[in-house]
């Protein structure tokens, strides 16, 4: 038997009222003394009543569980799974597409971020195409150096070298408005 005169204390799920919502509390012989004094008041939308057993009272706590907010620094979606207020660095508004930044009230296009991305993308493309050109040039150059190249190989070597020079001249800072030279295989 405990101090309250009951050894039948157990945790159960209780619906106090349709207007109060769901809570968990300890019930025993004297559990009827633990009452929600405001059970006839409506709980505002976005809140839930939580019973504090230390204070023997109900408190309203923000409830955004199951909702998605967006980090204003990264635009990443964050799923809310716990009770309590939202972090300060989030918004309900989702970014529309890529290269968005938060201006304090809305998502706006981040032209600078997009430009930097396009330049990096163009540099990667240029490096990849230069590698392909060098791979084609190497065996053709070997054939010429060994004086065993056919006319077709000599012609292809010249075309690939010209392509590589033109490719090297591409200004990636103008991305995405780049006119790439034509690959000799495609001519």
Swiss-Prot record:
InterPro entries: Phage_T4_Gp38_tail_assem, TFA_Chaperone. It holds the Pfam family Caudo_TAP. Encoded by the cryptic lambdoid prophage DLP12. In the C-terminal section; belongs to the tfa family. This is Protein TfaD. It comes from Escherichia coli (strain K12).
């Amino acid at each position: 038997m405990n101090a309250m005169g009951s050894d039948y204390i157990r945790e159960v799920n209780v619906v106090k009222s349709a207007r109060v919502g769901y809570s968990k509390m300890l019930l025993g012989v004297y559990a009827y003394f633990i009452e929600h004094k405001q059970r006839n008041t409506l709980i505002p939308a976005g809140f839930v009543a939580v019973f504090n057993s230390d204070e023997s009272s109900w408190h309203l706590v923000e409830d955004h569980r199951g909702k998605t907010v967006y980090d204003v620094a990264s635009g990443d979606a964050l799923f809310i799974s716990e009770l309590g207020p939202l972090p300060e660095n989030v918004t309900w508004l989702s970014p529309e597409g890529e290269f968005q930044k938060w201006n304090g009230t809305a998502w706006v296009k981040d032209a600078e971020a997009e430009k930097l991305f396009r330049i990096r993308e163009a540099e990667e493309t240029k490096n990849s195409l230069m590698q392909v050109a060098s791979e084609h040039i190497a065996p053709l150059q070997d054939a010429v150096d060994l004086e065993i190249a056919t006319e077709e190989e000599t012609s292809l070597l010249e075309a690939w070298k010209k392509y590589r020079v033109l490719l090297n001249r591409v200004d990636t800072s103008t991305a995405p408005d780049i006119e790439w030279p034509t690959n000799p295989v495609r001519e």
